[in-house]
Amino acid sequence: MFIQFDSVNGVKIDKPFERELKVLMSPDNNANVKDFTFILSTLAPNGGCTDFHSHNESGELMIFLSGTGRAWFEDSVYDITPGTALYAPPGKVHKTLNTGNEPLQIACIFIPAISTDYILKMREESERARGNS
């Protein structure tokens, strides 16, 4: 299966966890994809981030494609640059933050596959954090 990132519409998550999520490959959108979900996460410049979170049903491999930032995993903090990666096994808490002036683009691969309802949960958590729910 071949895909161009720009051909997929994303879902925008507003502040405080400002980013865009694009489901590029998933069992939810392609019957040929069975064992993983591939989401492109683009964190907004100057502070776009995720909250501290974990995925009980799946591990997450994060491959940092562009931009700079910081990642928290368990008791460690890592500087993010293009060409670095982080794996968070199922149930392990992690967070990413864009510390630069450019978008921070992350290829997020979930093994085993997760439901793309995950994106709706991320949007709801952002709304709750802003006090809008």
Task: Annotate each predicted stretch with a short phrase.
Residues 75-90:
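Short acidic-glycine-tyrosine-enriched beta hairpin
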Residues 1-35, 51, 121-133:
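A short, N-terminal "cap"/entry segment at the start of jelly-roll beta-barrel domains
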Residues 30-31, 43-48, 68, 112-116:
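Short, charged/polar surface micro-motifs in flexible loops or helix N-caps
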Residues 68-70, 77, 93, 103:
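Structural motif
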Residues 20, 34-39, 60, 67, ...:
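A generic structural signal for short beta-strands and their flanking turns/coil linkers
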Residues 34, 90-116:
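Ligand-binding loop in jelly-roll beta-barrel domains
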Residues 23-27, 39-56:
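Conserved short histidine dyad/triad with adjacent acidic residue
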Residues 40-43, 54-71, 109-111:
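Short, conserved beta-strand element in jelly-roll/cupin
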